[in-house]
A protein has these predicted regions:
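Short recognition helix of helix-turn-helix/winged-helix DNA-binding domains
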Residues: 1-72
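Conserved small/polar residues in nucleotide/adenosyl-binding loops
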Residues: 143-146
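Short, cationic-aromatic polyanion-contact patches
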Residues: 104-124
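Winged helix-turn-helix DNA-binding recognition segment
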Residues: 48-110
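Short, amphipathic alpha-helical interaction segments positioned at domain boundaries
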Residues: 117-138
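Residue-level marker of positions within ordered structural domains that often coincide
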Residues: 43, 47, 79, 116
Length: 146
């Protein structure tokens, strides 16, 4: 797993919304590492503009608010098994943090808990955001990066 201090997010401000259950889950751990660290790793892969990628000769688009995250690549980066990655992504999905769409080429991860981000003074709404909790049911986190 990358050192948390080395993670670089694609923008300097994020607005996220999540349930209290998701918030508590992020403060738990998987394989001795805080679950928030894994989510931050996914956030560092999130695109803020459309990106065209190619794997095995097949092209595909990664849209704003999505991350390209094959299970094998994440397993290697995070230092845990592929099944552990799959379970962790499933846990994130069940708590309304992400949505995973897998195909034979890769897994596209929608960062559905990210409401918006700010780049160059512009607020950009996340097209992948899905409101899963009402304001009184969850927590909103504003993450400022410098």
């Amino acid at each position: 797993m990358k050192n948390l201090k080395q993670l670089v997010l694609p923008c300097y401000k994020l607005e996220m919304a999540m349930s209290v259950e998701a918030w508590y889950f992020l403060h738990g751990s998987t394989d001795g590492i805080c679950n928030l660290t894994y989510l931050l790793s996914l956030l560092s892969k999130m695109t803020v503009s459309e990106v065209q990628n190619t794997k095995r000769g097949l092209g595909y688009a990664v849209h704003p608010g999505q991350a390209d995250g094959s299970m094998l690549v994440l397993a290697k980066e995070w230092g845990i098994g592929r099944k552990a990655v799959s379970r962790l992504l499933e846990d994130f999905s069940e708590r309304g943090l992400i949505r995973v769409d897998s195909n034979p080429v890769t897994s596209i991860i929608d960062m559905v808990c990210v409401k918006s981000w700010m780049i160059a003074g512009r607020l950009i709404e996340n097209p992948a955001y899905r409101q899963t909790v009402k304001a009184y049911e969850g927590a909103v986190s504003y993450t400022h990066l410098t």
